[in-house]
């Protein structure tokens, strides 16, 4: 039986939400994103095992907005309450409960969904101070669980993840097992590769190319971001053009695309490129969606 669920991570700015998500995912998701996006938009971290999938939604820090952008960020964070089954409300152990926390608590009460209080940064306080913090927050709301952690050091993080696993219900695997985020980097990577294909082949295969990012992961051995992409075309003749004589064209496409991708990610990249024929994919709705041309997403 496969189990799955969506979990929001809410809290004031700088309480360690992203640090927690990065630790759970085993890599810095923020590295593979535009800084403005990672701080202003919801970020999805997809944690998948053989039997479970937890889709974490890291949110912008909730604060009193002073600009339209601030309004957007806060509403973006609160909008996740309509999308998830569980909320992790994260607070810092080394700061007392404030007005910002109280504001969030009132919204959480109104949402009527299970809330786990996560007290982060326990490595910074004495156990007595932690107990006071627990009692204070417990007096404000009926939390499903209260879990103290140190996201930076990893203390008790696995316990929290196991708790979430235990509370998952039977469900679908919403994302492929090798996908760890919904970041637009996959889309940008595919566009960079497609741009090189169009540039180098000029008018030979202008409209029949789609690029799918099959996987994008950090290789712990080489410390490179390993990206596998498939260039889709509609005819065998187009496949031959893109591969080129003895693979020369495909190698050139990969070399130029890798350079741009490394500049975007700020990381060393190993880019693996493949070419496949998918006849008449441009006229098939399922193929269009599979290749990233989903009207709802872009």
Swiss-Prot record:
Membrane topology: Peripheral membrane protein
Region of interest (G1), residue spans: 11-18
Region (G4): 120-123
InterPro entries in the record: G_ERA_dom, GTP-bd, GTPase_Era-like, KH_dom-like_a/b, KH_dom_type_2, KH_sf_prok-type, P-loop_NTPase, Small_GTP-bd
GO molecular function, one term: ribosomal small subunit binding
Stretches assigned to the Era-type G domain: 3-170
Residues binding GTP, per UniProt: 11-18, 58-62, 120-123
Family per record: Belongs to the TRAFAC class TrmE-Era-EngA-EngB-Septin-like GTPase superfamily. Era GTPase family.
Job of this protein: An essential GTPase that binds both GDP and GTP, with rapid nucleotide exchange. Plays a role in 16S rRNA processing and 30S ribosomal subunit biogenesis and possibly also in cell cycle regulation and energy metabolism.
PANTHER family: GTPASE ERA, GTPASE ERA, MITOCHONDRIAL
Subunit structure: Monomer.
Protein name: GTPase Era
Organism of derivation: Streptococcus equi subsp. zooepidemicus (strain H70)
Encoding gene, per UniProt annotation: era
